[in-house]
UniProtKB/Swiss-Prot annotation:
The pharmacological activities of caerulein are quite similar to the physiological activities of gastrin and related peptides. Its main location: secreted. It is found in: Secreted. One of its GO terms (biological process) is digestion. Belongs to the gastrin/cholecystokinin family. Residues 197-233 are annotated as: Disordered. The modification Phenylalanine amide is found at residues 82, 97, 161, 225. Residues 27-72, 86-87, 101-151, 165-215, 229-233 form a propeptide. It comes from Xenopus laevis (African clawed frog). This is Preprocaerulein type-4. The modification Sulfotyrosine is found at residues 76, 91, 155, 219. InterPro entries: CCK-like, Gastrin/CCK, Gastrin/cholecystokinin_CS. Coiled coil: none annotated. GO terms for cellular component: axon; extracellular space.
Length: 233
């Protein structure tokens, strides 16, 4: 729209050519000025209308600006209040959280104190129980000395037992030697007894031959006896 108005003004200026009609220059100049004034007023009115259409009158724009500023101020104030409330709430929350932490610390100290009390009580109870089971410290010391003496005695006993084992080994070798001697003596005695009962080897051989002859004779006698019995039958 503005471009159309400017083109109209330019066309009006170009159409007012003073060289074409020099005799009527004053009249035409007044006409051009009147037309230009008319176009200027029209342009101003158009601009005013457009301005009012877009943003209203200057007073309206000022009022709008003030209203917008007031709205912006209100928004800013609202955001500030919101941020302040949030900050206050956060601060209050942190204060409450810190207060709860302090209370938790107090409770924790109470619990630790009670735990320390229980620990001391348990330690005292264990000490009393230990004294009851093992006696007083002097009694426990005496028991320890007695146990050490018993251990020393056991150690000495094991040493003696080992020493006795070595002595038993020696005695065992002696017994084995004496047993071997007895075995040899018994063998010799049996040999002597066998010789005494059956005579010398030559005599035993003669006895064996005699016994064989007697057996052969007995066998022959039995054969003859059987043969005679068969003939009799």
């Amino acid at each position: 729209m503005f471009k159309g108005i400017l083109l109209c003004v330019l066309f009006a200026v170009l159409s007012a050519n003073p060289l074409s009609q020099p005799e009527g220059f004053a009249d035409e100049e007044r006409d051009v000025r009147g037309l230009a004034s008319l176009l200027g007023k029209a342009l101003k009115a158009t601009l005013k209308i457009g301005t009012h259409f877009l943003g209203g009158a200057p007073q309206q724009r000022e009022a709008n600006d003030e209203r917008r500023f007031a709205d912006g101020q209100q928004d800013y104030t609202g955001w500030m209040d919101f941020g302040r409330r949030d900050g206050q709430q956060d601060y209050t929350g942190w204060m409450d959280f810190g207060r709860r932490d302090d209370e938790d610390d107090v409770h924790e100290r109470d619990v630790r104190g009670f735990g320390s009390f229980l620990g001391k009580a348990l330690k005292a109870a264990l000490k009393i129980g230990a004294n009851a089971l093992g006696g007083a410290p002097q009694q426990r010391e005496a028991n320890d000395e007695r146990r050490f003496a018993d251990g020393q005695q056991d150690y000495t006993g094991w040493m003696d037992f080992g020493r006795r084992d070595d002595e038993d080994d020696v005695n065992e070798r002696d017994v084995r030697g004496f047993g071997s001697f007895l075995g040899k003596a018994l063998k010799a005695a049996l040999k002597i007894g066998a010789n005494a009962l059956g005579g010398s080897p030559q005599q035993r051989e003669a006895n064996d031959e005699r016994r064989f002859a007697d057996g052969q004779q007995d066998y022959t006698g039995w054969m003859d006896f059987g043969r005679r019995n068969g003939e009799d039958d």
